[in-house]
């Protein structure tokens, strides 16, 4: 039996929830990609683009001991895009190289607005938190870049010699 890559939580950030809509399959797509990569997904939460809800969801994952939290959405430049700001408040240590890798892999895939994403990546306790833009293309490309980097970081955090 293969050892799981880690436990994960997905947090979909969308104002569509306020209007009674869902996250348009973003959480399901992230779940599918993480499971394919060997992660055990503990759950998928959907919250509106509000600091309190986002912070609560992130803290739920950190306190619950998941290895990886992937937020989807709310990474742009509008006043309602607060996911990176809240994430920056929750993390203990930033991983700006991974955030830049996400932006540049999007650019390489032809998503020219990828560099406008304000998404951050960092560690809170022993949990990696990563912000990914909400489009299906951004999710697919972002997870392809994020998963091996997150695995490496999770391995470092769980190694008693390195950690």
Where are these regions (language model features)?
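Non-catalytic beta/alpha edge segments that cap or flank active sites
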Residues: 1-163
């Amino acid at each position: 039996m293969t050892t799981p890559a880690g436990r994960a939580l997905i947090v979909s950030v969308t104002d569509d929830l306020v209007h009674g809509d869902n996250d348009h399959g973003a959480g399901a797509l992230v779940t599918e990609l993480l499971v394919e990569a060997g992660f055990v997904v503990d759950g998928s939460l959907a919250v509106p683009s509000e600091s309190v809800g986002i912070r609560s969801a992130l803290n739920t994952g950190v306190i619950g001991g998941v290895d990886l939290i992937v937020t989807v959405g709310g990474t742009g430049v509008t006043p309602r895009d607060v996911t990176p700001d809240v994430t920056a408040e929750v993390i203990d240590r930033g991983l700006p190289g991974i955030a830049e890798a996400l932006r540049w892999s999007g650019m390489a895939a032809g998503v020219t607005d990828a560099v406008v994403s304000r998404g951050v990546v960092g560690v809170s306790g022993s949990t990696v938190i990563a912000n990914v833009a909400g489009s299906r293309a951004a999710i697919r490309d972002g997870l392809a870049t994020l998963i091996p980097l997150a695995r490496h970081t999770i391995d470092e955090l769980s190694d008693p010699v390195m950690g």
